């Protein structure tokens, strides 16, 4: 598809915690939320990191549910159009500079026959300071 690109304008932001739907852990951050056509804002890693409980998502060890690729895929399965991951160094296990310098320009990919339905249309990252500003501007903390 020559000239194909995605754009979201005035997309509503919905905070979805870790953005995890894991039936085997009886965990679903999307339960009761309507994210269809919206942009989800997601914490990096998985719920086990915050609790350090080894019985919950392997505790401090990141599971597949903590990976950024999973978060974009799950957001798409839930009907979101965009997803923004909030980066924090400790739970990500790498600094903001890795994110900042890994994707420093436009990102291009091939448009598959399914129009890349396995991922949200727009993917992004913000650091904690920007996330705090977003929430403050929305009247949230």
Predicted segments, located by residue:
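Noncatalytic luminal/extracellular "stalk/propeptide" segments of secretory-pathway proteins
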Residues: 1-54
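Second-shell loop/turn segments in exported
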Residues: 1-4, 15, 25-30, 54-72, ...
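Mixed-charge, polar/low-complexity N-terminal
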Residues: 15-16, 20-22, 58-59, 104-106, ...
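Structured segments of extracytoplasmic/periplasmic soluble domains
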Residues: 17, 33, 43, 71-74, ...
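Detector for Asparagine
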Residues: 21, 28, 45, 58-60, ...
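Flexible, low-complexity junctional segments that flank or bridge functional domains
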Residues: 55-66, 70-77, 96-99, 103-109
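Long, well-ordered, tryptophan-enriched scaffold segments
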Residues: 77-94, 100-104, 108-141
């Amino acid at each position: 598809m020559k000239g194909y690109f995605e754009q979201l304008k005035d997309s509503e932001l919905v905070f979805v915690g870790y953005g995890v739907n894991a039936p085997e852990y009886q965990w679903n951050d999307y339960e009761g939320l309507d994210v269809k056509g919206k942009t989800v804002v997601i914490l990096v890693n998985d719920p086990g990191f915050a609790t350090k409980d080894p019985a919950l998502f392997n505790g401090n060890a990141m599971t597949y549910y903590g990976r950024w690729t999973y978060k974009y895929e799950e957001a798409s399965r839930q009907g979101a159009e965009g997803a923004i991951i909030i980066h924090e160094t400790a739970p990500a296990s790498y600094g903001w500079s890795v994110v900042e310098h890994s994707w420093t320009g436009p990102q291009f990919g091939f448009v598959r026959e399914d129009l890349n339905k396995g991922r949200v249309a727009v993917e992004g990252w913000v650091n904690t300071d920007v996330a705090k500003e977003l929430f403050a501007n929305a009247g949230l903390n």
